[in-house]
């Protein structure tokens, strides 16, 4: 009762309970209502009333009148509730919703006039197109508008998520299949609510969601309430059949009569058409002929249309003017006899005249036709010929079932599907010609032997890596861009053995971390085969670019030399990766004068040395190869080749677990890198100890050349005071095992028990502190070396903010060390053997995108988790972090109702003004402000191809395309302009109502808000080197396959089409 009787039930009745005084109105006799009637109190009131009636003051009498009025109101409310099926004061009773204003039914003319006025306003163009192009009747137009309004309310209110999420379906309208038969488009429109005379109208935003078959998935929308037109009864079906027959007949008529048909249907007034809509005398005579045909027509369907359109059953002839008025045709200069003659002739010929034009069918030159008919036919032939050149739809044509071929650009031929991460192969691989390795780079020898020819120069289609190494050798695969083969003389290598060793792929873009290493005895012994001290060649001096200054060329700075590598150790890098992620290598002219160019020095026993001049720039002494795979950029420094007598260090393990993640940094900064095994050398320190004689090296050696471009990933610099052994980290672009790195790059692990590993760095050196690599970061010089769980900081120009805009802090697996400066004689110990990453830790799941633990940060080259979503997800607020994989009881995150209309707010993925990534992740104390540890959250919500292919159009701030007005020469609506109810049927009377939300009315009326929205032509579109595309700009070229811009309609099968609306004369003035 509360909801129906409202707030005013207790107005001015402080003494009476609700529902009393019912007896005074006599209501309890007719309809006492289920309300609690307090009979006793009201009876007492009735007994006292005759006595106190005269003593009542004026205010009491007014209160009594108000009470009687409220009783009347209550009775009306009760009856209304009973009629609507609601009984008051019942449990679980939800009263019906009543609109706040009176809704008066509209006639079609009001809406038509409003649509015609809306054409003038560009922001109302879509609504007018909806009304005028599809020709709905009033009921269905209102149904369309109410459905759009319902969807607007749903968006503003948000999903009513009940337990289990069954209350409101959150439809993400994407599909992994390439051809999905249903697409949705939205059009947003600012209008006023339809109230009479715009009194009290509210400005609302209409967002209509329309479906079109075979339409592109233009935008991710939430579904409006699926509105189904009311089923047509038998009378409606008769009416639809009549309308369809009239449209079919109209399609056969000549164009001039079709135009009069449409004018009469549009205006509904014969006088208006006669006096205002016909320009020439020939048009007036055509109107007279049309009226003659209508007056004698015996087709019930045409009669029904005509009388329904003009509004009465007695057609009047507008040329019969009232007697005191000069008729309109006389003012136009047409005689009465001409009009009567044309009218009678059309009456005799009937409906066939509208199709043939009045003349005999096969005889265009007959003399029997009148003069006006002859002239009319000549011009009509011209019009029809020009009409045929316009696009039209034949009434008997098959309906379009797919997009026309002209709009379908060819989907590029798919390459063989491969995994987007380098796959380790720990078994022998026979070389095949099948190009299946799509992302893992060619891991073949730099030497292409006659029995194993090198791959062809096809960077776009890399071949399956065939790892063939000598028996004692491991392959450290470092990727370089293609280089020209060099003419160097060297003895051919021993025959390669087919044993595939674990390879560490280290390059600019990806860091592959070796987790499990099982070193065998043979590898340990081969690692100890170092060249004696006398064979260590003095590395040449190079002065590099502006980032590194002459501090690297200080002769006192020595560099622990590495044993030389055979040419078939196969350092190579894919040209694709180099092209994409690396700055172009410095040309020989940029690297400095010819005296400071890198010189390749071989040991004395090698034989002839090759000096790399600036013009030739050979990287190493290697036999000429057929492919460009083994050459490094000239800026990365030399590679020293050893004679085959000096056995190579075999550091490759047998079991290698690799993990790749895409580099998020844009440019590389810092000096030259080394292989991963020298970086991880501290593991084998107790096993491989060198004799102390080879651990020292003459300090006269000068530093080998560094790269002239700065490294892409660097570690925290540490001041090397004393004779600490610098552990050379492999910088991600290095090709050479003998490259030095500046000591900004030397990670040193502090553990008091483990001695320094000198086996891999046989020469000690005292490195004076060089100048800072990055100006303005002097504080980094004094910080400690990273602890094992440390993740490397990013350069300040590209901070890595975590997946959703949170700074990645080191995993809680390792305790952060307190920060303190290094004292003078401080020696940083190596990684302890206790922290050896054994085969049981960490275990990675099969999916390399998903890892739930924080163990990855224990690897030195780790640079943060792989971001599992596109860089601009749609809902960026902090609580919408969906779990990366659906769990039990997974419910959707909270709803942000304004995100549907507002541009997204970028938190930290764009890298503009957010907080920078902390350069000292190990300085975060445990008591600091709590940060979200995203590394422990599983990282994929949906499969990756779905996320990449359905990147929402909000993911990048692209300009929204305005809603285009529709050209007039559009294919016609499939229904009559007045009463179609979106139902197509043939003349036999069977109706096939097409659901408007699956219909094609939106084809002309609306265009997608975002023309650049991606279309999932395949599950995975245009990926970068690993995983889905990072930005919508990268995919926008490849995804403009099926756009929704084409003005092609899909019509119901049996709708009879005409070509009137495609004409040039279709504007009605």
From Swiss-Prot:
Highest taxon, organism lineage: Viruses
Disordered, as annotated region: 1-75, 353-708, 733-776, 884-932, 1008-1069
Main location class: host cell
Family to which the UniProt record says this protein belongs: Belongs to the herpesviridae EBNA-6 family.
Quaternary structure and partners: Interacts with host CTPB1; this interaction leads to gene repression, but also seems to interfere with the repressive function of CtBP pre-bound to DNA, leading to EBNA6 mediated up-regulation of many host genes. Interacts with host MYC; this interaction enhances MYC stability. Interacts (via N-terminus) with host RBPJ. Interacts (via N-terminus) with host histone H2AX; this interaction facilitates H2AX proteasomal degradation. Interacts with host TP73; this interaction inhibits TP73-mediated apoptotic pathway.
Chain's role: Plays an essential role for the activation and immortalization of human B-cells. Represses transcription of viral promoters TP1 and Cp through interaction with host RBPJ, and inhibits EBNA2-mediated activation of these promoters. Targets host chromatin through interactions with host transcription factors, especially RBPJ and IRF4. Alternatively, EBNA6 also regulates the transcription of the EBV oncogene LMP1 in a cell cycle-dependent manner.
Keyword ATP-binding set for record: no
Pfam families in the record: EBV-NA3
Biased composition (Polar residues): 543-561, 1032-1048
Protein's UniProt name: Epstein-Barr nuclear antigen 6
Cross-referenced InterPro entries: EBNA-3/4/6
Record's compositionally biased regions (Acidic residues): 381-391, 507-524
GO biological process: symbiont-mediated perturbation of host apoptosis; symbiont-mediated perturbation of host cell cycle G1/S transition checkpoint; viral latency
This protein's record includes keyword Cell inner membrane: no
Low complexity biased stretches: 689-708
Residue ranges with Basic and acidic residues bias: 50-67, 742-751
Keyword annotations: G1/S host cell cycle checkpoint dysregulation by virus, Host nucleus, Host-virus interaction, Modulation of host cell apoptosis by virus, Modulation of host cell cycle by virus, Repeat, Transcription, Transcription regulation, Viral latency, Viral latency initiation and maintenance
Localisation: Host nucleus; Host nucleus matrix
Gene Ontology cellular component list: host cell nuclear matrix
Source species of the chain: Epstein-Barr virus (strain AG876) (HHV-4)
